[in-house]
């Protein structure tokens, strides 16, 4: 019937396919248990829904129909879903009682085109315990039963199969150890128990024994069954059979034929009837080999030859025979038959050997080295066992030609030690390079007739010294791995071979230390030290690492030294298509871009170019462009390789004004990845721009990347130039701000300065000489102005600076002399300078530190009449005008708004600096608050109120001449916050005599310098000029010109002097005194040092030409100020001439080098 059904289906559906499905389900599952899904497991295509199936005479019952079912009451298939399920509980034991493997089969017709052959295996579970056929077993055993007597027991039954079946038996409740249990197996694997008597039974002591037999299966957990064994001890027969002799001896040749009678035994029993009838048999403990060689007749007691006898195997055989009667409880009788075999020459000699060298011998072994110990035996006796032995192809006993070496000889011989024992030794030196292995054959022959021969061969390997390193089969191993691999993946193997033997040839592999970038190679790969297998330790990325190399070391285990070699392994990472294309042109928003095309665009008009990027390489990165949707009217075409979209139809009136194209970019990897973009193309009115050609067919276009690169490059160059320009301008303005001070602010006004580039003539009123040494008043407000050790250790500090236009750099003309270490800032001026502590000529120096200081000794000063304290207070507030000069504002509105100088509510820094400059040491430290300052100073004019204030505004007034009688200079000074009635006191000199007086300028005794508020009284000093002053050298020969010229000729900058480090110190050392002449009284010259005017000019010119040098160069100048070789004490100088020379020198410098002055 099945054949007819299949034929019908084959005729009806010619495209049928056959599929096999195997399922398994444990037994005892309930009804409705799903075993499997036929459609999913067979990977069948889903059929039509039941509502759509039908027609053509086909059934509408479902997609799955059961054609054949071996157990329809147990299994069924859902017609619609294809689920295979159970209809009821399945019992394997009842279904397949006698079969270990239980299997059901079905044939299902699915989707009208596939036939599924289904097999369901019913798996056994341990649901059945072993069972016995009865609960008790009754046994009768005679008390005379000998120990070892066996009694079969009833076996248990377990319907389960396999491991769940019956496994073993246990015997319990045997308190006296009389019985034992032996479990045996039949040919089919079933197990059965036997009861064994361990000790003799005594009915008189106990006539009944109760035992428990337990059967166990192999399930988890195991199940068991028990049965009770009742043993009854029965009384036995009183008489047993008796043999004629207790033992018999029989001689028999070893080659006796089968059936030969060995002996005829006879035993008698005094009992009558069954108790006297005797039966013969072998005893239970007769070996199986004897049973194989002999047989016995149970009634007659005749023993015959059953097998082949061998003297050499056993020359004497013993046969135990028992005789028992047929009465109840028989007691058997026993006798022993000894069979002695007669030897025949039927055995060849036997050769055995023990290798001393374990089959290996070093090639350095000397002659006579023992290789093996040989023993030759013959199982035959007498002459048949007499032997002769020799080495085939070697020397020794009975030596002769043989095989195994050059000329058919081997370098070995046989030496006899004692009977049948020989030693194989070398008889000449060995050479492994000639032959590395020998096959030694030993021949033995006996003395029988005819003689029999035997041979024995063994191999001797010649060991080499460890003189060969491992050698790789390749110098370079190239391995490949796909990216995104799994860590631990096998990459390949390297193989190194070592011709040495043993440990000398055992090769181990390792990776030599190296790095890939900054990462150790041990984080990339590992090698199996035994077989050279290389594994990846990480997942590789082709885009990051395309290939890398490392070295593998192969090392043998030889002694005394390991030999090694290495090979290079190159791992190439293969690209995997793991990156999808990314569309970069046109710019997409939500995967959509809008484009416009003129209506008069002709055929081949370039609408746009679609560009995509793919990070993969090779075929995985090669892209293809195509239009997948929206081009039903074939209005556009796209170049598959370049992505250019061109028109195929003019945009006439009847064409849709908006076209939506779907462009797909696909790479060529496996599997392929793609990206999709939607392009909305709108036709707009108007004509093509001029220069855009109408092309019919292919349109030549230019690459957009070139103008893009050019545009970006141009923009970058313009931005770079703008940044450089701004940086240069900001640097110049910052430099002007840093060099700005209130003393020269007035030159920034156009009416005074005459424009930015116009220079103002410098006169003597532009130079201010004040004393910079002040006593420290407040330790909390100290500004350190020393920049070198020479300044820190010098008692006096000099600072010379002229008022220059704002375009000039800070301190272009400045002469420094060591001065006091600290400059105390009054607490009232903390808003301007308290937070600043600097060194050297800092950009934030106060005007007081920039004022020129000149040293005088006993200078006969004319009276310097100062105004009252009220007048000075009035003059100190003139710079509070909003248009006042600022230390930071250049006057052109370019100051930073964060600068504090713009705050007009704060006090002027110039006012503060003036107060600092006018502070001096007094005996009275008592201070009182200042009076309220007036708005204007009495010295101010209308011009200065409009254009800015000058020195005349803040300088003290000159009083009338009738006040000149005051000889103490401190009475001519007014110091803010100090009482007006200053007690007259002179400063102590450094002279040990302690005379308190002012020394005349140029005298030996030197005191502290006096503070000069105004230079005019001293310019009127009636001091005659020295004759040295009359002889002023010409400008062409002066060293000043020699210094200025190279500075002004170097591109208009003062930096030209920097080409000669130390030039300033070298030039100044010719004219300036050293610190030692002022510090130590013991080293003072007898005549005080003086400087001629030309020498002062030279020094100031040198300083001026090197004003831009750094603080370290200025420190070198200061160290040269105390040159010990200067002897200018004979020269007298007039202060007015000094100022005149400085004024002339500065005007010359500005006239000759305006660029340098500006910078």
UniProtKB/Swiss-Prot annotation:
Location of this chain's protein in the cell: Cell membrane
Positions of glycan attachment: 22, 266, 439, 453, 504, 566, 590
Chain segments carrying region Disordered: 858-909, 1108-1132
Ranges of compositional bias, category Polar residues: 867-879
Biological processes annotated in GO: adult behavior; cell adhesion; homophilic cell adhesion via plasma membrane adhesion molecules; negative regulation of synaptic transmission; presynaptic active zone assembly; regulation of synaptic vesicle clustering; synaptic membrane adhesion
Keywords in alphabetical order: Calcium, Cell adhesion, Cell membrane, Glycoprotein, Membrane, Repeat, Signal, Transmembrane, Transmembrane helix
Gene Ontology CC terms: GABA-ergic synapse; glutamatergic synapse; plasma membrane; postsynaptic membrane; presynaptic membrane
Domain Cadherin: 18-132, 133-243, 244-351, 353-472, 473-583, 589-695
Residue ranges annotated as Extracellular topological domain: 18-707
Signal sequence residues: 1-17
Record membrane topology: Single-pass type I membrane protein
Cytoplasmic topology ranges: 729-1159
UniProt motif (Cell attachment site) ranges: 186-188
Name of the featured protein: Protocadherin-17
Gene that encodes it: PCDH17
């Amino acid at each position: 019937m099945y054949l007819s059904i299949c034929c019908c289906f084959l005729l009806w559906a010619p495209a049928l396919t056959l599929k096999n499905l195997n399922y398994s389900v444990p037994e005892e599952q309930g009804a409705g248990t799903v075993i499997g899904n036929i459609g999913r497991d067979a990977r069948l295509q889903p059929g039509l829904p039941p509502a759509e199936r039908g027609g053509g005479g086909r059934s509408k019952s479902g997609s799955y129909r059961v054609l054949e079912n071996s157990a329809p009451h147990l299994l069924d298939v859902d017609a619609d879903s294809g689920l295979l399920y159970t209809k009821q509980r399945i019992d394997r034991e009842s279904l397949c009682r006698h079969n270990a493997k239980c299997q059901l089969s079905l044939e299902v017709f699915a989707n009208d085109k596939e036939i599924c052959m289904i097999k369901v295996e019913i798996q056994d579970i341990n649901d059945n315990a072993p069972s016995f056929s009865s609960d008790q077993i009754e046994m009768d055993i005679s008390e005379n039963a000998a120990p070892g007597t066996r009694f079969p027991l009833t076996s248990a039954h377990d319907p389960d199969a396999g491991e769940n079946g019956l496994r073993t038996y246990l015997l319990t409740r045997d308190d006296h150890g009389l019985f034992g249990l032996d479990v045996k197996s039949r040919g089919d694997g079933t197990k059965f128990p036997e009861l064994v008597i361990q000790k003799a039974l005594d009915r008189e002591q106990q006539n009944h024994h109760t035992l428990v037999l337990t059967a166990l299966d192999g399930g988890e957990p195991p199940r068991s069954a028990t049965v009770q064994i009742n043993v009854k001890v029965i009384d036995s027969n009183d008489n047993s059979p008796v043999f004629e002799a207790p033992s018999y001896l029989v001689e028999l040749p070893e080659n006796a034929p089968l059936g030969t009678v060995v002996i005829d035994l006879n035993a008698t029993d005094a009992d009558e009837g069954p108790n006297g009838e005797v039966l013969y048999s072998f005893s239970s403990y007769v070996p199986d080999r004897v049973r194989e060689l002999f047989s016995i007749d149970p009634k007659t007691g005749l023993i015959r030859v059953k097998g082949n006898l061998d003297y050499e195997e056993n020359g004497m055989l013993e046969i135990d025979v028992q005789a028992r009667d047929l009465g109840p409880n028989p007691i058997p009788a026993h006798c022993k038959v000894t069979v002695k075999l007669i030897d025949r020459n039927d055995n060849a000699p036997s050769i055995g050997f023990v290798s001393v060298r374990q089959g290996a011998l070093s090639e350095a072994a000397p002659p006579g080295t023992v290789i093996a110990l040989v023993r030759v035996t013959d199982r035959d006796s007498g002459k048949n066992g007499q032997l002769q032995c020799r080495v085939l192809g070697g020397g020794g006993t009975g030596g002769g030609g043989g095989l195994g070496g050059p000329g058919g000889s081997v370098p070995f011989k046989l030496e006899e030690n004692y009977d049948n024992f020989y030693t194989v030794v070398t008889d000449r030196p060995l050479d492994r390079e000639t032959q590395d292995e020998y096959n030694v054959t030993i021949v033995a022959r006996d003395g029988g007739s005819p003689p029999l021969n035997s041979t024995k061969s063994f191999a001797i390997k010649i060991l080499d010294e460890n003189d060969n390193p491992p050698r790789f089969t390749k110098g370079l191993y190239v391995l490949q791995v796909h990216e995104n691999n799994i860590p631990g993946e096998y990459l390949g193997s390297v193989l190194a071979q070592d011709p040495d033997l043993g440990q000398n040839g055992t090769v181990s592999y390792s990776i030599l230390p190296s790095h890939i970038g900054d990462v150790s190679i041990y984080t990339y790969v590992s090698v199996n030290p035994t077989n050279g297998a290389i594994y990846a330790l990480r997942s590789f990325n082709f885009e990051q690492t395309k290939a890398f190399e490392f070295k593998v070391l192969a090392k043998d285990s030889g002694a005394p030294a390991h030999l090694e070699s290495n090979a290079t392994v190159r791992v190439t990472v293969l690209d995997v298509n793991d990156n999808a294309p990314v569309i970069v042109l046109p710019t997409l928003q939500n995967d959509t871009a809008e484009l416009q095309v003129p209506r008069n665009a002709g055929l081949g008009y370039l609408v746009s170019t679609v560009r995509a990027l793919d990070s993969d390489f090779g075929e995985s990165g090669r892209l293809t462009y195509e239009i997948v949707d929206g081009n039903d009217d074939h209005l556009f075409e796209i170049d598959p390789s370049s992505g250019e979209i061109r028109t195929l139809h003019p945009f006439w009136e009847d064409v849709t004004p908006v076209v939506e194209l779907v462009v797909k970019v696909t790479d060529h990897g496996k599997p392929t990845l793609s990206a999709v973009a939607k392009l909305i193309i709108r036709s707009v009115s108007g004509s093509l721009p001029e220069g855009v050609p109408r092309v019919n067919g292919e349109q030549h276009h230019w690459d957009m990347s070139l103008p893009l690169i050019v545009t970006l490059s141009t923009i970058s160059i313009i931005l770079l130039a703008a940044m450089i320009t701004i940086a240069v301008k900001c640097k110049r303005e910052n430099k002007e701000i840093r060099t700005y001070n209130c003393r020269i602010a007035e030159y920034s006004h156009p009416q005074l300065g005459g424009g930015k580039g116009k220079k103002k003539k410098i006169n003597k009123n532009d130079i201010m000489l004040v004393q910079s040494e002040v006593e420290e008043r407040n330790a909390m407000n100290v500004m350190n102005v020393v920049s070198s050790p020479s300044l820190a250790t010098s008692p006096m500090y000099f600072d010379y600076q002229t008022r220059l236009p704002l375009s000039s750099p800070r301190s272009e003309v400045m002469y420094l002399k060591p001065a006091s270490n600290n400059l105390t800032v009054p607490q009232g001026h903390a808003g301007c300078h308290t937070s600043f502590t600097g060194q050297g000529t800092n950009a934030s120096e106060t005007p007081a530190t920039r004022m020129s200081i000149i040293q005088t000794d006993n200078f006969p000063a004319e009276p310097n009449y100062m105004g009252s304290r009220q007048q000075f207070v009035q003059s100190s507030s003139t710079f509070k005008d909003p248009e006042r000069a600022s230390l930071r504002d250049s006057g052109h509105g370019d100051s930073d708004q964060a600068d504090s100088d713009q705050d007009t509510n704060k006090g002027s820094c110039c006012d503060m600096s003036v107060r600092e400059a006018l502070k001096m040491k007094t005996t009275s430290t008592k201070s009182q608050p200042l009076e309220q300052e007036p708005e204007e100073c009495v010295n101010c004019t209308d011009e200065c109120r409009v254009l800015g204030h000058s020195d005349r505004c803040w300088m003290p007034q000159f009083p009338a001449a009738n006040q000149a009688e005051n000889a103490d200079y401190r009475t001519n000074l007014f110091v803010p916050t100090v009482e007006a009635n200053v007690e007259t006191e002179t400063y102590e000199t450094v002279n040990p005599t302690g005379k308190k007086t002012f020394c005349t300028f140029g005298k030996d005794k030197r005191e502290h310098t006096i503070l000069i508020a105004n230079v005019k009284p001293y310019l009127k000093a009636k001091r005659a000029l020295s004759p040295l002053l009359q002889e002023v050298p010409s400008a062409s020969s002066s060293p000043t010109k020699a210094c200025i010229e190279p500075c002004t000729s170097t591109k208009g900058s003062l930096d030209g002097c920097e080409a000669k480090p130390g030039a300033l110190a070298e030039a100044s050392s010719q004219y300036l005194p050293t610190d030692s002449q002022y510090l130590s009284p013991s080293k003072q010259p007898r005549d005080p040092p003086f400087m001629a005017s030309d020498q002062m000019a030279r020094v100031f010119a040198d300083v001026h030409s090197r004003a831009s040098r750094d603080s370290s160069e200025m420190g070198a100048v200061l160290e040269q100020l105390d040159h010990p070789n200067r002897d200018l004490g004979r020269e007298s100088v007039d202060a007015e001439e000094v100022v005149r020379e400085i004024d002339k020198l500065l005007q010359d410098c500005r006239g000759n080098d305006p660029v340098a002055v500006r910078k």
